[in-house]
C-alpha cells in the first residue's frame, strides 16, 4: 500500500512561475505542394500511409486501484497518450462514416487559503430552538446526517433561495410569516449552496465566455495567440458568505475551480464537493477537414475513402505535434483565488508529481476533484484531491464518500467488442472533519443509475447495477440487459498489499431484458424497480452480506422513478402511469404508489393516486403534466409528523387567435401547483389534501414565456404551514384551512451563460444586497 504525500500550498504566498507554451490552431496542410491533384474538383494529401497506421490497440483490464505515478514525466506521458488515443479513435470513426461531415490523479494537497482583510466569521455558538425534522422540514436527503447541496435551504428561522442570478434571504419570525431580508447578486449561474451556522457557500457555474475581457481571469484562462479558445469552457465558483447579519451578507472568500460542478455534501461542518474538469487542447483535432470537392464525388466513389484515410493520418500526425509542444501544467486543472483585488493562480502539481494517481487500467483526460472545506476553520482551508477519470456519480454516508465512474471511456470499446461495461468504485473515509482519506477501490460489471444505487451500511458497500444497458450500436448482437446487486467490504490485496474493495456476495439475473429505473437501500434491504413494458418491484434481503437473495417481486403497470421508504412496512414512490393498453408509459401522467412490504416475500400495492394539474384532465388542450419530483428527489417533500406529501405539478398551453381586425395574438397559459397529499400507513390510503397555486405569478397581460421557470421548485413544511418556492414568488399556506397566509412576489433575473460579467473587488467583505435596512434577523434574539 502506498503512502499519499501531502503538499502544502499557501494561497497568499508567492507561486513559482509556469511557462505556458503558446500554440496556434493547427490546420490540415491542404495546400499546393503538399497535395496531389486527382481532378480539378478535389484534392487529397500526397501522403504514403504506413501499413500499420490504423491498427486497433487491444485493451487490457487489470484493476481499478488508484496507482501513483513515479514522476512528472510519467504523468505527462500517460495523459498525452490518453488524449492522443481518444482523438485517434474519433478520427478512425470519421473514416468509417460515409456521410460524415466534419466540422486525479490522487493527491492530498492540504491548502490553506489566505485570510481576507477582515478575517473569517466565527462558528455558531448557540443551538437553534427550532429543530429540523420536528418543527420544520429540510432538504430531502438520501442519508440521515448527510446534507446535500441544493438551491433552497432553511435553518428554521430563515429561507435561502438561489433565484436566477441572485441569492434571496427571507426571514421567518414566526411560522406562517415571511419577510424579505436581502437580495445578493452572485457571479455566474448559481446552482446550489451549503449552509452551516453563519456561513453559506454558494456554488455557481461561470462560463469562460461570460468573463469580462478586463478581468485578469480572462488572461489566465485564454491560450496565448489562440483567439477564442479557453483552457476550459466552464469554472466552478465558490462564493463563501458571512451571513451573521442576514440583511447584509458579506463575501468572505472567492475561489474558482476549472471544471464542472457535480455535487456537494456536508457532514459535521465539513463540505466536500466534486468537480469534473476536461481541458481544451489547442491544436488538437478529432474531426476531418474534408475538401469541398469531396461532396461532389459519387457516394460510392472509392476516392472518398482514400481522401478520408489520408486526411485522418495527417490529422493524427498533427495531433502528435500539438501535444508534444504542451507542458504538463497546460493539461492539468488550476485553482484561482481573488485576494485583496489580486487574482492568484495555483497549479496543482509538485516537482515530483508523486501525488497523482489513476486507475491501473483506465487512463482518461478528465479530472475528478474532491475539494474538502472545513467551515469551522477560520481561514477556510481545504484539501484538493484529484483522480484522473470519467464523469463521476457521488454517494455519501456519514463516514464514507463513494465515487463511481464508468471503468472505461466510450472510445475504449471501439474495435474491442469483447469488453463489457463496468463501474469503478473509489471509497474515502470522511469520519474526521476536514479530512478525506482514500481507502480503496473495486469494480462491478454494468453501469450504476444514480446515487440511490449505492449504499454503505455497517461497513458493507452495496451496489445495484445493470449490465448490457448501453448496447453498442455497431454490434449485431449486443449482450442482453440484466441487473445485479453486489456487496463489497474493505480488504487487502495479497499481491500488492493495497487496500481494496473485495466482493463478498451478489445476486444476479434480476429482471432479464430490463434495466433499473429506481433503487433504494434501507437497512438490510434493497428495493429495485425495473422496467420494460411493466414495473416489477423487487425486495432483496441483505441481512447476510455474503448471501443476498430476492425475497419477493410484484409486477404492476407503469414505473416508479423514485422510492421513498416510510417505514419497515411501506414504500411511497413517484413515477409515470401506464399507457392506455396497460403497457409502456404515459409520460403525461404523474402517479404515486403506496407499497405494502410488511411481508417482504409478497409485496402488494395498498393504493395508487394519479395526479393532474388541471381540473379536467380529459381537456386535450392540456396534453401533459410535469413534476420535477419524478426525477429530482429534492423536489419530493414528505413530512412524517403530519403524514403529508408535497409534490410540484405543472403544465402550460399555447393559445393563439385573430381579433376582428385580423390581428394575430398569442399567449401562454400556465398552471403551476403544489399538490398536498394525505398518506396514511394505517389505512393504506392516499388522498388529495389540498393545492397551492402559483399560476397567478405567471399568467399576466404580457404573456411572458417563462421556459421551465414557472414550476414550484421546492417546498418546506414549517409548523402548521407550508412554504412553496418558485421563481416569481413564495407563498405561505395554512395546512389546516389551505388558505394563503402571506406571499411575496419576486423578480426573476434570467441566467445567461454567455453574458459578460464585471466582478467587483470583495477584499473588504462586500455584498450587493437590497431589501430590508441593515438590522439583525428578526429571530436573532431567539438564538
Features from the language model and the residues they span:
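Short, Lys/Arg-enriched N-terminal segments with co-localized hydrophobic residues
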Residues: 2-14
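Sec-dependent signal peptide recognition
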Residues: 18-24
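Short, low-complexity interaction segments enriched in Ser/Thr/Pro/Gly
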Residues: 13-16, 772
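Beta-sheet-rich non-transmembrane sensory/scaffold domains
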Residues: 34-783
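Hydrophobic core
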Residues: 26-33
Amino acid at each position: 500500500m502506498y503512502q499519499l504525500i501531502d503538499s502544502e500550498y499557501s494561497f497568499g504566498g508567492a507561486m513559482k512561475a509556469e511557462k505556458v507554451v503558446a500554440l496556434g490552431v493547427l490546420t490540415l496542410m491542404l495546400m499546393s505542394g503538399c497535395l496531389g491533384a486527382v481532378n480539378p474538383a478535389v484534392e487529397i494529401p500526397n501522403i504514403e500511409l504506413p501499413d500499420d497506421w490504423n491498427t486497433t490497440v487491444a485493451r487490457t483490464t487489470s484493476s481499478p486501484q488508484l496507482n501513483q505515478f513515479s514522476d512528472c514525466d510519467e504523468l505527462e506521458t500517460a495523459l498525452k497518450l490518453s488524449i492522443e488515443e481518444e482523438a485517434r479513435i474519433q478520427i478512425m470513426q470519421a473514416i468509417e462514416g460515409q456521410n460524415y461531415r466534419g466540422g486525479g490523479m490522487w493527491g492530498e494537497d492540504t491548502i490553506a487559503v489566505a485570510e481576507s482583510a477582515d478575517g473569517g466569521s466565527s462558528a455558531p455558538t448557540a443551538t437553534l430552538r427550532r429543530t429540523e425534522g420536528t418543527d420544520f422540514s429540510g432538504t430531502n436527503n438520501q442519508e440521515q446526517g448527510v446534507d446535500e447541496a441544493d438551491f433552497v435551504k432553511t435553518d428554521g428561522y430563515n429561507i435561502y433561495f438561489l433565484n436566477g442570478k441572485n441569492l434571496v434571504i427571507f426571514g421567518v419570525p414566526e411560522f406562517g410569516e415571511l419577510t424579505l431580508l436581502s437580495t445578493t447578486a452572485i457571479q455566474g449561474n448559481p446552482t446550489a449552496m451549503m449552509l452551516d451556522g453563519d456561513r453559506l457557500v454558494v456554488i455557481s457555474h461561470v462560463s469562460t465566455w461570460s468573463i469580462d475581457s478586463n478581468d485578469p481571469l480572462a488572461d489566465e484562462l485564454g491560450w496565448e495567440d489562440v483567439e477564442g479558445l479557453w483552457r476550459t469552457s466552464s469554472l466552478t465558483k465558490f462564493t463563501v458568505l458571512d451571513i451573521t447579519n442576514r440583511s447584509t451578507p458579506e463575501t468572505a472568500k472567492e475561489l474558482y475551480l476549472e471544471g464542472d460542478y457535480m455535487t456537494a455534501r456536508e457532514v459535521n461542518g465539513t463540505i466536500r464537493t466534486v468537480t469534473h474538469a476536461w481541458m481544451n487542447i489547442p491544436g488538437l483535432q478529432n474531426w476531418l477537414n474534408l475538401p469541398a470537392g469531396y461532396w461532389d464525388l459519387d457516394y460510392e466513389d472509392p476516392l472518398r475513402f482514400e481522401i478520408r484515410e489520408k486526411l485522418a493520418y495527417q490529422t493524427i500526425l498533427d495531433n502528435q505535434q500539438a501535444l508534444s509542444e504542451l507542458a504538463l501544467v497546460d493539461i492539468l486543472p488550476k485553482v484561482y483565488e481573488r485576494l485583496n483585488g489580486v487574482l492568484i493562480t495555483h497549479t496543482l502539481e509538485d516537482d515530483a508529481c508523486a501525488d497523482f494517481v489513476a486507475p491501473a487500467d483506465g487512463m482518461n483526460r478528465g479530472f475528478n476533484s474532491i475539494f474538502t472545506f472545513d467551515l469551522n476553520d477560520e481561514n477556510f482551508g481545504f484539501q484538493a484531491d484529484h483522480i484522473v477519470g470519467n464523469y463521476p456519480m457521488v454517494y455519501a454516508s456519514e463516514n464514507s464518500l463513494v465515487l463511481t465512474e464508468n471503468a472505461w471511456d466510450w472510445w475504449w470499446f471501439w474495435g474491442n467488442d469483447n469488453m463489457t461495461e463496468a463501474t469503478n468504485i473509489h471509497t474515502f473515509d470522511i469520519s474526521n472533519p476536514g479530512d478525506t482519506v482514500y481507502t480503496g477501490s473495486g469494480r462491478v460489471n454494468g453501469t450504476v443509475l444514480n446515487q440511490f444505487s449505492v449504499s454503505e451500511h455497517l461497513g458493507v458497500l452495496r451496489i445495484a447495477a445493470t449490465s448490457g444497458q448501453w448496447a453498442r450500436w455497431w454490434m449485431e448482437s449486443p449482450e442482453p440487459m440484466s441487473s445485479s446487486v453486489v456487496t463489497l467490504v474493505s480488504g487487502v490485496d495479497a499481491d500488492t498489499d493495497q487496500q481494496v474493495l473485495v466482493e463478498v456476495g451478489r445476486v444476479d439475473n434480476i429482471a432479464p431484458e430490463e434495466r433499473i429505473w429506481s433503487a433504494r437501500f434501507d437497512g438490510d434491504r434493497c428495493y429495485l424497480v425495473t422496467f420494460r413494458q411493466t414495473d416489477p418491484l423487487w425486495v432483496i434481503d441483505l441481512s447476510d452480506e455474503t448471501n443476498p437473495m430476492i425475497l419477493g417481486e410484484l409486477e404492476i403497470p407503469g414505473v416508479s422513478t423514485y422510492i421513498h421508504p416510510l417505514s419497515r412496512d411501506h414504500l411511497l414512490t413517484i413515477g409515470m402511469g401506464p399507457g392506455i393498453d396497460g403497457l409502456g408509459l404515459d409520460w403525461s401522467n404523474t402517479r404515486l404508489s403506496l407499497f405494502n412490504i410488511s411481508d417482504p416475500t409478497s409485496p402488494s400495492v395498498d393504493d395508487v393516486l394519479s395526479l393532474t394539474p388541471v381540473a379536467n384532465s380529459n381537456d386535450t388542450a392540456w396534453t401533459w403534466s410535469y413534476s420535477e419530483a419524478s426525477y429530482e428527489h429534492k423536489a419530493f417533500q414528505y413530512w412524517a409528523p403530519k403524514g403529508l406529501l408535497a409534490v410540484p405539478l405543472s403544465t402550460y398551453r399555447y393559445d393563439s387567435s385573430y381579433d376582428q381586425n385580423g390581428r394575430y395574438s398569442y399567449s401562454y397559459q400556465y398552471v403551476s401547483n403544489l399538490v398536498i397529499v394525505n398518506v396514511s400507513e394505517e389505512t393504506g390510503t392516499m388522498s388529495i389534501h389540498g393545492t397551492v397555486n402559483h399560476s397567478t405569478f405567471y399568467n399576466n397581460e404580457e404573456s411572458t414565456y417563462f421556459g421551465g421557470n414557472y414550476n414550484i421548485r421546492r417546498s418546506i413544511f414549517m409548523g402548521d404551514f407550508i412554504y412553496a418556492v418558485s421563481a416569481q414568488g413564495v407563498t405561505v399556506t395554512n395546512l389546516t384551512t389551505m388558505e394563503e397566509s402571506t406571499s411575496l412576489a419576486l423578480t426573476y433575473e434570467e441566467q445567461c451563460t454567455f453574458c459578460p460579467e464585471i466582478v467587483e473587488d470583495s477584499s473588504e467583505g462586500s455584498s450587493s444586497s437590497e431589501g430590508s435596512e441593515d438590522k439583525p434577523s428578526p429571530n436573532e434574539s431567539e438564538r
